[in-house]
Amino acid sequence: MSPGDSALDYAKRQAGNVSSQAPSRPSSENDANGTVSTSNEHPSNEAGPSRPRSMGSERSASPQQGTTPKVPTKRRRLNAELAFSSPGPAFQVEQHGSEAQSDSNDSSGRARRPRRSTTLTKSGSNESQDRRSSAHIPKRKEEAGESRNLAESVPKNKLKLNNGKARASDEVELRESSLSLVLPSRSRSRSKSVVKLEPDQDSAFPQEVATPTLQPTRPKPQITPLTALNPQAALSEILARRRSERIALAQSDLEDVHDGHDMLVRELFHLTKFVTMVGYDPDVARTDQSDVFTTFKHAHDLRFSLDDSGSGAEASTAARVTRRRVNARLESLSLKRPDPPSTPSTPSFSKVKVDDDKKSAPEGRRNRRFSSVTGAQPRVNGAHTLETGHSDDTDDSSEEEDSEGSDLDAYSPDGREKGDAKDYNASRKGDAKRARLSSTPHKRHRAKVQDASSNAPVKRTGPRKSKALDELDAFILRQQPRPLPDHPPPLHILAPHQIPAHRRFGGDLDALYESFNMLQDDEGGLEDDDLETYIKLDQRWRAGLPIHPEAGSTTRHAVQKVPRNKSHHDHLLESVTSSYSQMRQYAKLKQQNSRKVARMIAQHWERQLGTSEREKKAEERRLRALAKWTLREVLKQWRLAVNVVRARKAAAEKAEKEKSDKEQLNAILEQSTAMLKKQHEVMTRADSLDDSDDEGSDRTNYGSDGSAESEISDIDDDDNQLIQIQDELPSVSPEQSLDMLTPVPEEADGSKDRVSNTTDHEAATANGDPTVVVESESQPSRRPQRRTARTKTFKARDSKLDADDIEFNDAGNDDEQEDAELERQMLEEDEEDDSEDAGLAADANIPIEELLKRYGYGQEADQDAEDSDAGEDAVSNDDSLENSATKDGSEDVAAVASIKIQEDAEVEEERPVQEDSMPDEAMDLEDDAVSTALNRPSDALLVDDHSDAESAATSGRRSSRRSMTRASSIVSSDRHATRLRQPFLLRGQLRPYQQIGFEWLCSLYANGVNGILADEMGLGKTIQTISLLAHLACDKGVWGPHLVVAPTSVMLNWEVEFKKFLPGFKILSYYGNQKERKEKRIGWNTENSFNVCITSYQLVLADQHIFRRKPWVYLVLDEAHHIKNFRSQRWQTLLGFNSQRRLLLTGTPLQNNLMDLWSLMYFLMPNGATELPGGGAFANMKDFQDWFSNPLDKAIEGGTSMNDETRAMVQKLHAVLRPYLLRRLKSEVEKELPSKYEHVITCRLSKRQRFLYNDFMSRAKTRESLASGNYLSIINCLMQLRKVCNHPDLFEVRPIVTSFAMSRSVVADYEIKDLLVRRRLLQENVWEKVDLDVTNLRITDGEEHLTAIESRDLRRLNAAKKLPHFREAVPEPRELDTWTLEGFERSREQRKLVDRMEKWKHMAYLNQYRCTKRPIYGSGLIKMLTEAGEAARLEPLEQHESDRRGFLTRCDSVLRIVQSRSTRRENMQALIDRFAFVTPRAVAVDMPRWALPGLEAHQRPDMVKREFDTVHPVAVKLHIAFPDASLLQYDCGKLQQLDILMRRLKEGGHRILIFTQMTRVLDILESFLNYHGYRYLRLDGATKVESRQALTEQFNRDARISAFILSTRSGGLGINLTGADTVLFYDLDWNAAIEAQCMDRAHRIGQTRDVHIYRFVTEHTIEENMLRKANQKRLLDNVVIQQGEFNTETLAKRLDWTDMLDESGKIGDVEVVVADQGVGARDVESAFLQAEDDEDRQAALRARHEMFIDDADFEEHQPSTSRPNTASATPLAHTASDGARPDNGAHAADALDAHEIENEHQEQEQEQEQAASIDDYMLAFVESDWPFFA
């Protein structure tokens, strides 16, 4: 037998098992009648491999007494089995009753815990393989429902028993084979062996189909249609066949459901574990039987999900599950096959005895408890019996009886099942077994399975059911749902309408089945009757009559519901609803009253039981609370008293401090006034000199001609020789040389002790201890000694100047002449090198004393220290020093430095200044002193004539080239009032104001005071400093070393200035990387290795450990505002340097507030003013803030006018700062400096600018940003508006307009219609219908054969006017007169006349056209033109000019008329450029195809050539519209004004500097200047530092360059652009101080023309607000600061973004919310940088990097002190009381204070005795014991 036939036979037998019929009547033996009802074996389409599940519900039964009992199957049991909830391992539909019962017993409703390993021994396959093979079975959900319905519809009387042995054998084989296929191993662990089932030798079919396939081919069972059945077959056979098909279909659907669920569980497991389905393989998933998956599958088993009783996985896992319990459950749920028989040939039969448990429900013979147990009995017993081979002892005795009784009780003798208890009792005829069975209907029945190998029943022995199984059964019983009751519950009818309707068919299902009329029944008569009825109804419907004649109308009326009278029940319900709310309220009220009563009773008894104890506790709590409150109030009063006393003490201390501060301020003012007075007296001693100055003293530059340069070079050479001689002398040691040339310091009080070095003091000051008093160093006392001839009165020099005298060049000389002069001087110096070497060699053999005398450095022999009192004989100017020498035999050599202000200081101490009482007088004195010092005429510089003469006698080679006379050297007869001479080492001539500054610096050095030179930019602070250092070398013998710290960008400028004006100094430029700096430090500590060291702020911080160890004479800080922050690391580092003197150079000593100025002042005087002669102390930071900073800041920020008190405070501040600060403005000191004029040019917005401006302001986002108050958003909006004002391309670039190119034109869509129209139009020849030759409309017809002469002759032959009726009018035709013959003839003749006249008229018309035909050109002209050129076509003359041979055969005059395409384009280029600018919105690229339909590119290859496309540029202009270059100017109002301004400046020969803030504006300006053809240069932040000087020199030298465009962020302080006399600010910068610096680049020394400053401001924009705020600040600066004469930068701070708003805080009509967010200056600067473009941002950063290399140090907070015993770095000056008050005054004050304290104590005691108030007592007590309370 083939596998296919085996599978088919297996399916048939399986379907037969399900649909086996029951016997007609029960019998304990064989059927008496011998009738055996055989069931038809219906074909089944199920294949063998598709049934891998065990038929665990089947039991093997052995024959008893040689008979095989017939097991009936009831319809109710079939219905129950079709709806079972736990499929279990045997997932199939069973029809046999015994099998159904076995399934009900075996398949428990509880959750089965799956085994970790399930192994099948059948043909090497396991359960997983079987499930995998069955996973591909198609779904059968629909067929399952049909099979279930069909099984329910089977009539009871159709069932029959099957008692054939072959049938029983097949059933046993099938059960055993299916059991052996899928019986799993119930071992608890993997180590145990699996349960192996031996194959049944008699069942060959399961062995053949045991091996599953991966893709089982199991076709879906089909339902045989009724038409395919045998018409002669009985109805029972048809039903049986249909039943078997339905059951097979349902079985297939159930298997599909199970397989589909299994695959879904596996997919869910994969998703749960691996999240994604990427690596999911169905074939691999089917073979997965791991422990993890088995556990996961157990939670999703269909047995638990379909079990409605709740005894699944959820119920079973609720309690604690032990191993014993699990094993017991697994044993109870496992299905084990009994051992095979010993004799293989003996077939095994199975007898299944089933008790019909469900029949008790309709019969009502069982109570509710046992019916529920029986109805939901889990299939446990059968499975347990089959596995263990024995059952419980309690079931042995009744098992056989139960099984027999179940067979007999099910059916009555007539084969019908009884529906009630009476029929059932009548059918049992006194049978004992039946009586026993009937007497015990509620007994629990179990099926008995006997061994197939024995004939007699096998007695089961073994242990009883375990306790775990009892608990499991009890748990299952508890979890099972309550089944339906055996009898329907009683109906509680409350109303008539609630009475149920009668059942149809009496509730009998059989009657319902019999009511159906099946096909092929002998009921044709009914169909005939119905047919007649249908015919009649159809006829009425077709006739339009109503279908039901009795209706009478076709309108359907709704059936009205008959109103029902209210019954008693209705009234009862209404009363219940109405009284319900009242009852609820009454119940709540009763509950509330009950609670109240209960509480009252409880409170009563509580009071009765514990009243006394409770009252005691309450009283105790009250007293404790009262005590706490009293204590709190008393402490509050004492705290108040302490606070009052503390406030009194603080007020007294504050008053005392104010008093001491006032005294200190007065002392400072007194000291400053005295010092200023002395400076005024010293600097005005030469007022008696003759004021007649030579014109050379007022020259505008300190460069001189060749003679002056050679003279200073000679002086420098002398000095160099002197230094060389001193170095080469072996007899003089360095110490002796130092004693001879270096001054000896002296203390300020005149003592003879040496002064210690100031390094320790400055280090201590840097550490924050400013109270340490260190002896100050005095200035050097030695100076070059004048000769005796210098004491005589100088004689007046001859007014005539020799040829060798110094001539001052005018400022208008060109730079080229100066460069040539410098080159000539350098050549002369090179020629003199040989002679200088010879002079040095001769001087080398001269003793040092003679050399000193020769060069004016003689030593005095006077050693008297009293010479300091006779100052009128020893000093000649304000820095004259006493000459002292060492005494004989003394070890200490002291040089006394006397200051002329000591005597005046003593006088001032005797006459104290009452600052408070007479402030006006003091201020007047100060103002007079300053005005006298600043406004006095420029005095002449004196040069000793005798000294020069003797020097010339010593070195005659230089006397001829040195001028001994100056025009300004006229002195008075007072020899002691001579001014300081200019150092002879200094090359060049100082200006008068520079000479004053030089003398002021010298006086500072002489007085031992540090100072600030704060001249305005461009006044020569550098040359004044160089002059001071030269003076120290020449007159004091102090050669350094000096340290100059400058910004990196001006280090080169310092080196150049030193080499230019002081070449005799050795300059060390300290820069480079670490290695280069290390090489430059070689010989660092060698004496005279260098005189001046120039470095930057960055390097001085990097190498501070090196600079700190070296002693410096002068520490010069250029751009000293770099140390304005005393908390910065730079300030603290430089403060600790070892330097004798300090000089600060800055153009802006006060940038932000007065604390910046205080930082500079404290840096100058770390010890305060005590080191000055006369004592005194400079204020500390807090006092300075209280005195000056806070009041002035408040007055300035408030914007109000200053009151008298504030004005007096400002005057005091001027008086304090004036002795240490010198500041001159260019407008004050440089009288010949050209004027500066400022202009504001308002510009209108262009149309595009106005559109963009209004569009941006109208945006919702802009309004939201302005109203938000976020300063970042507001600044961004302001920056966008400024871009629109500067140029619209900055905001939005004008686009390049192009046409939209369409690959397919619109005409292409109508191609088909066009062809259709053309075809229809061309069907007829239009020229055949219309003769154009008649009307001369064919204009080209006569061009070839008609000439002009012929046309003239034709016009002559025109005879139209001679034709008849030509001039007569044609009458109107009349109607025919048919009334009479005459009338008819008349009308007829008239018609003929009309026709004749019309004919002649038409002939004349045609003749007129034919005779007037004339050609346009004529054949003659065409022939002539053709003959003039080539015969093919006329060509331009350019193509034939090269052909000389054809000169005679062509007419050049004619050919010149013909122009080529290129020539014509050139001639029309102006029109093309002007008008070819409009581009179409869209173009189509396929238009040539439609415009020239018959012309192809291959037909005319010459048209494809590039030369042919001469109109391509024109086409490009029409396709792509580039913005016109002129739009760059006309789109911007500022550029329109700039065009007008540039034209006017160009005509006047002016040159302009154009400044802007934005880098992109520079690009636009470049395009603008290139468009107009102006020459220009550009300098921005990206320009390298070394290129800036070259650009500057090129602009100043080349007058052809009209403009220089620069960025305000370009940096480079000190750039000289005096070649331009016009400055234009294209846009306003955020920082107004930057604009001042930009102006100074043109308006500075060297400028010969007036400078005009222009500002472009766009009207009605935010630029007007910016200009208004800037003007206000400049006005306030002019009123408040310039009057102080010490600073112009107080209010030159950055413009705030709020300044650009209107006075009402609006921009246009949009109100801007200004939120107070505490935004700092750095935040605002960062916001500005963010709002700007990237290029401008980078330029600003580079500029700031150049100006402030370590800008981060300015904001750096002071580092916290980490070391103990280290004071803060914040400097505090001495108080006024330190060392200022004498001892006797202190003792007197102490005695007075003690006396006052005693008096106060006595008064307090008296007040305590007489005090009537507790408050006074408390205050007095606190004051008496204040140390305790404090």
From Swiss-Prot:
Composition-biased stretches (Acidic residues): 393-407, 711-720, 804-821, 828-837, 861-881
CDD domains (alphabetical): DEXQc_SRCAP, SF2_C_SNF
Positions of ATP binding: D1015, E1016, M1017, G1018, L1019, G1020, K1021, T1022
GO molecular function: ATP binding; ATP hydrolysis activity; DNA binding; helicase activity; histone binding
Record-annotated Helicase C-terminal domain positions: 1537-1692
Regions of compositional bias (Basic and acidic residues) in chain numbering: 167-176, 352-365, 414-434, 749-763, 1790-1804
GO annotations of cellular component type: Swr1 complex
GO terms classed as biological process: chromatin remodeling
Alphabetical list of Pfam families matching this protein: Helicase_C, HSA, SNF2-rel_dom
Domain of life: Eukaryota
Compositionally biased spans, kind Basic residues: 783-794
Compartment annotation: Nucleus
Spans annotated as Disordered: 1-204, 329-465, 681-921, 940-974, 1754-1814
Catalytic function, reaction form: ATP + H2O = ADP + phosphate + H(+)
Segments of skewed composition (Polar residues): 16-42, 57-70, 98-108, 117-127, 1759-1769
PROSITE patterns: HELICASE_ATP_BIND_1, HELICASE_CTER, HSA
Residues annotated as domain HSA: 556-628
Coiled coil spans: 602-679
Compositionally biased spans, kind Low complexity: 177-186
Gene3D superfamilies with a match to the protein in the record: P-loop containing nucleotide triphosphate hydrolases, SWI2/SNF2 ATPases, N-terminal domain, Tandem AAA-ATPase domain
Start and end residues of each Helicase ATP-binding domain: 1002-1167
Summary of the function given for this chain in its UniProt record: Catalytic component of the SWR1 complex which mediates the ATP-dependent exchange of histone H2A for the H2A variant HZT1 leading to transcriptional regulation of selected genes by chromatin remodeling.
Self-association and partners: Component of the SWR1 chromatin-remodeling complex.
Family to which this protein belongs: Belongs to the SNF2/RAD54 helicase family. SWR1 subfamily.
Name recorded for this polypeptide: Helicase SWR1
Organism of this sequence: Mycosarcoma maydis
Gene: SWR1
